[in-house]
């Protein structure tokens, strides 16, 4: 799994309520608010980890006979959108007997979460690689019932209404290496979703018609995908570049109720600073065409871009964000990070009226020294509020 997930990145775009995550296997999909990264964690800290190491007849572990590794990591957290919540990723990492030395491990994952406001979700993930990592295949199934606040389009007004949204989603992606470090492929998504408002006794956001929020939709998209990856480590890169681009198309000819397009491009850059530091930078832009349902509009607060915003408090057809994060290891286990960024949302390319900013810092504890996977605790201040984050793996 390429930089497996905080499940920014499934960020289940269907469900704006799902907290931030990075891209599961870089499919730009998210399942919940915790990365499903795993490998040789610390038993008793975030759950029990089994390295699947078999012993030889003389009682010594033989690294050549390693068959599988697993992790279970229950993580409590709290955010403005859901209140207290518990996320539990369960991951199994293994190499089939026919896998070659260049093939990454296969990953089977199960993820679930439950929140104080009675939101819940559960998902399955399977990631496979074939032919010396020439082919990468990812599949996911997800079911969720979410309660979250809708602030209208644009954002910053403060008023909101609570929406109930149920969704079932299936996703499959196939990528093929066509040049060194360059992959091309397709991602297909099919989902059913029902959504309706819990109308409060308060003034509604300007221009908001509650009847427009009651929907029962079938969603289906086909998305050409590009990925360019020169990172030296998929879990904690110290150098290299990661570029992702996709163009999702929805048409009735493939079973969708709506016709629209969604475009997204992102670039992460990593630079080693001395022996203990890393400067990570990221730029992302997203665009949605006419006909896109509001819950698929780009928004801050549902991914790793511009931490410090409640989910969906700023959403519109265009989004752009730039951020940098300095990561430092004080010891083999203990580290910290400081980050900041700027961004905005707008109805069109020339409509950038309000600049948004974000700044924060966090603590890191390395759970898996072999692959540099850390427990991440961040506090971020945005334009309007302060938000706390707990997860496994780096934000991007």
Range-by-range predicted roles:
Residues 1-4:
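Positively charged n-region of N-terminal signal peptides that target proteins for export
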Residues 7-18:
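Bacterial N-terminal signal peptides
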Residues 23-73, 77:
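N-terminal periplasmic/intermembrane-space "pro-region" immediately following the signal or transit peptide
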Residues 48, 52, 59, 210-212, ...:
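C-terminal outer-membrane beta-barrel translocator/porin domains of Gram-negative envelope proteins
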Residues 61-72, 76-218, 373-374, 380-396:
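Gram-negative/organellar outer-membrane beta-barrel architecture
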Residues 70-72, 86-88, 120-124, 168-172, ...:
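Hydrophobic, lipid-facing positions within transmembrane beta-strands of outer-membrane proteins
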Residues 72-74, 90, 108-112, 137-141, ...:
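Membrane-embedded beta-strand positions of outer-membrane beta-barrel proteins
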Residues 226, 283, 350-356, 366-396:
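Predominantly the C-terminal beta-signal and adjacent terminal strand-loop region
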């Amino acid at each position: 799994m390429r930089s497996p997930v905080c499940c920014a990145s499934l960020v289940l775009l269907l469900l704006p309520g799902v907290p931030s995550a990075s891209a599961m296997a870089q499919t730009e999909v998210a399942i919940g608010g915790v990365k499903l990264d795993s490998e040789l964690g610390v038993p008793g800290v975030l759950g029990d980890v089994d390295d699947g190491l078999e012993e030889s007849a003389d009682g010594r572990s033989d690294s050549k006979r390693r068959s599988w590794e697993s992790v279970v990591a229950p993580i409590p957290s709290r955010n403005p959108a859901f209140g207290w919540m518990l996320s539990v990723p369960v991951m199994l990492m293994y190499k089939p007997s026919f896998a070659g030395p260049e093939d990454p491990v296969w990953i089977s994952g199960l993820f679930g979460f439950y929140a104080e406001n009675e939101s819940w979700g559960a998902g399955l993930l399977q990631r496979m690689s074939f032919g010396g990592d020439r082919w990468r295949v990812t599949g996911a199934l997800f079911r969720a019932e979410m309660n979250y606040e809708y602030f209208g389009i644009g954002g910053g007004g403060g008023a909101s209404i609570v929406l109930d949204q149920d969704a079932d989603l299936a996703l499959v992606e196939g990528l093929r290496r066509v040049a060194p470090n360059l992959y091309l492929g397709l991602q297909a998504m099919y989902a059913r979703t029902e959504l309706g408002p819990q109308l409060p006794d308060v003034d509604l956001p300007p221009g908001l018609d509650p009847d427009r929020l009651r929907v029962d939709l079938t969603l289906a998209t086909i998305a050409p995908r590009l990925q360019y990856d020169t990172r030296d480590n998929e879990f904690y890169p110290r150098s290299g570049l990661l570029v992702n681009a996709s163009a999702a198309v929805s048409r009735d000819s493939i079973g969708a109720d709506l016709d629209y397009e969604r475009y997204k491009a992102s670039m992460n850059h990593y630079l080693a600073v001395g022996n203990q530091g890393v400067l990570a930078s990221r730029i992302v832009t997203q665009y949605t065409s006419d006909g896109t349902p509001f819950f698929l509009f780009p928004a801050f607060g549902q991914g790793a871009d511009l931490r410090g915003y409640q989910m969906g408090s700023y959403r519109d057809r265009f989004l752009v964000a730039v951020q940098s994060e300095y990561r430092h290891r004080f010891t083999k286990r203990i580290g910290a990070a400081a980050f900041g960024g700027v961004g905005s949302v707008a109805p069109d390319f020339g409509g950038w009226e309000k600049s948004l900013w974000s700044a924060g810092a966090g603590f890191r504890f390395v759970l898996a020294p072999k692959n540099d996977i850390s427990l991440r605790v961040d506090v971020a201040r945005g334009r309007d509020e302060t938000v706390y984050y707990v997860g496994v793996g780096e934000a991007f």
